[in-house]
Regions:
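Positively charged n-region of N-terminal signal peptides that target proteins for export
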Residues: 1-4
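Bacterial N-terminal signal peptides
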Residues: 7-16
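Protease-domain processing segments flanking chymotrypsin-fold serine proteases, especially trypsin-like
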Residues: 19-149, 192-296, 301
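Extended extracellular/luminal ectodomain segments enriched in beta-structured repeat modules
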Residues: 143, 152-159
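Non-cytosolic beta-sheet module surface loops
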Residues: 150-152, 162-166, 283
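Short, surface-exposed beta-strand/strand-loop-strand elements in extracellular ectodomains
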Residues: 166-182
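Serine endopeptidase catalytic core focused on the charge-relay Asp
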Residues: 205-425, 434
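Catalytic nucleophile loop of clan PA
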Residues: 293-294, 299-304, 430-456
């Protein structure tokens, strides 16, 4: 028996949950004989609340304005941004042609919601930001600091890409945006140097200018520093909370039939929604949105922060390293259109499992999830036809929504070149969109909590065609890949 302590505001509840092996004899056998496993599962777990104040980060050095290196990037053109928005809009309107019906629905290939495009460095700018070209000043602690600013004109937010060689021990790099100068991200040099392929992407900061401060433990270390800015991702939509510009990634945001999670009368669905987060990541300088779900595991000694999402969102360690997560991005009221207080975590993730044909990706965050986050349960058995389904997601990058439907069949996706077998789901409330990709479908366990069963590949659902199916990955068919991490 695994004893889990659930921490929630204003109350402390003790939740006793059976581990996978204890529950195996009571689990109903799956109807689909393709499953590799029959009854392995996990229940929910809440991360403890931590009321300690986080340290206030700040730039440690004072660099006079005339000593700050400043460069401007070659930003994407207005036409480039317009085309990206058109592409997003095309995904949003994928379901039914004007005047068409459900039978005319065109399947939506898998597609993350794009919110950023590459911005490029000139050779002159690259040379100007080389460590030996910066002005280094004493930091008052025996070390040295240098600062530089990079601008991509009219960006709503920005992140820098670095080629990483040697980072001296004890180095710290700090990042801040000009539109939110009280939010400073401090990254240990060891974390930057630890990327597998020598490519590092900074945290996303708000505004069109990012300021970078490099602090070295010894002034002599500047001769050993190998850190080169090679470009940036210019975000044309702001991924931060309470910002309606994100909705302009498409012309109108998510579709009109989407339902805020706050509208749900299902307390178990509202609870598991705390495991669902918005994912922002960067591929080749372009930035995208998908949805992910924090998963529990059956190990008693540790609770590792695994995220279940989609292979078509993140399929390489390089991209997983760019991951930035947005938690509790949801309205507190049924009719709300903006998020309440939310939490942003940078730092990337380790890629643990990814599989093209099943469209499954499992990552492990490089830092703990925020205080009070929920680790969702999961069930690796097959889902029977006509089972009720709940989907929780961020359509078009919008605040968290809930969709209700039914698993109707097992199917090949019919698009995207993938050959796996998937769950087919039709909705009676809500639908999915670009940005929903990777989001989970859940079924209720015998305890009454929700368990993850798969993640969104794509589909053809639309507000005017809720009966047009969406396609979800099947955890049961690839649990042999997931088991070493989720049920070691």
């Amino acid at each position: 028996m695994r004893k889990l302590i659930v921490f929630i505001p204003l109350a402390i509840l003790s939740l006793s949950v059976s581990a996978a092996a204890d529950r195996a004899n009571n689990a109903a056998p799956p109807e689909n004989t393709e499953s590799f496993v029959t009854s392995v599962e996990s229940e929910i777990y809440y991360a403890p609340l931590d009321k300690r104040a986080l340290p206030q980060e700040r730039f440690v050095g004072f660099t006079p304005a005339h000593m700050v290196a400043r460069v401007s990037l070659i930003a994407p053109t207005a036409n480039d941004i317009k085309q990206a928005r058109i592409d997003n809009e095309r995904v949003a309107k994928r379901g039914i042609a004007a005047g068409g019906d459900a039978e005319s629905a065109v399947p939506r290939d898998e597609r993350a919601q794009q919110i950023g495009l590459p911005a490029y460095m000139s050779e002159t700018a690259t040379r100007g930001l080389a460590p030996n070209a910066l002005t280094w000043l004493p930091d008052g602690l025996g070390g040295a600091v240098a600062r530089f600013d990079v601008t991509s004109a009219d960006a709503k937010a920005i992140r820098l890409g670095f080629n990483v060689g040697n980072i001296p021990r004890g180095a710290t790099v700090r990042f801040v945006g000009d539109a939110e100068n009280d939010r400073i991200f401090a990254v240990a040099g060891a974390d930057i140097a630890g990327t597998e392929d020598g490519e590092y992407w900074s945290p996303i900061v708000l505004g069109d200018t990012i300021s970078v401060e490099i602090q070295l433990r010894s002034a002599r270390d500047r001769n050993a520093l190998e850190l080169e800015v090679f470009g940036a991702s210019h975000l044309f939509a702001n991924p931060a909370q309470n910002d309606n510009d994100l909705l302009k990634a498409t012309k109108a945001g998510s579709q009109s039939c989407e339902v805020n999670i706050a509208c749900s009368s299902d307390s178990a669905a509202k609870a598991v929604a705390a495991a669902v987060m918005r994912l922002v990541f960067t591929k080749g300088g372009s930035s995208f949105l998908c949805t992910g779900t924090l998963l529990n595991d059956t190990a008693t000694a540790t609770t590792r922060p695994f995220i279940y999402s989609a292979n078509h969102c993140i399929s390489t360690s390089t991209v997983a390293n760019t991951l930035q997560t947005f938690w509790n991005y949801q309205s507190s009221t049924c009719g709300g259109t903006t998020s309440g207080p939310s939490t942003t975590l940078a730092g990337g993730a380790f890629l643990r499992v990814t599989d093209f044909n099943s469209d499954i990706t499992l990552m492990e965050m490089k830092q703990p999830p925020p205080s009070g986050a929920l680790f969702a349960g999961w069930n690796a058995g097959a889902v029977a036809n006509n089972t009720g389904i709940v989907g929780i997601h961020h359509p078009a990058g919008d605040i968290k929504k809930i969709s209700l439907g039914t698993m109707t069949n097992n199917a090949a996706p019919g698009f995207s070149g993938k050959t796996g077998t998937y769950y087919q789901v039709v909705w009676n409330s809500g639908v999915t969109e670009g940005g929903s990709s990777g989001s989970a479908i859940f079924t209720k366990s015998t305890s009454g909590s929700y368990q993850l069963r798969g993640g969104l590949l794509g589909g053809s659902s639309f507000c005017n065609a809720q009966s047009s199916p969406d396609i979800y990955s099947r955890m049961d068919l690839k649990f042999n890949l997931l088991q070493p991490f989720l049920a070691p």
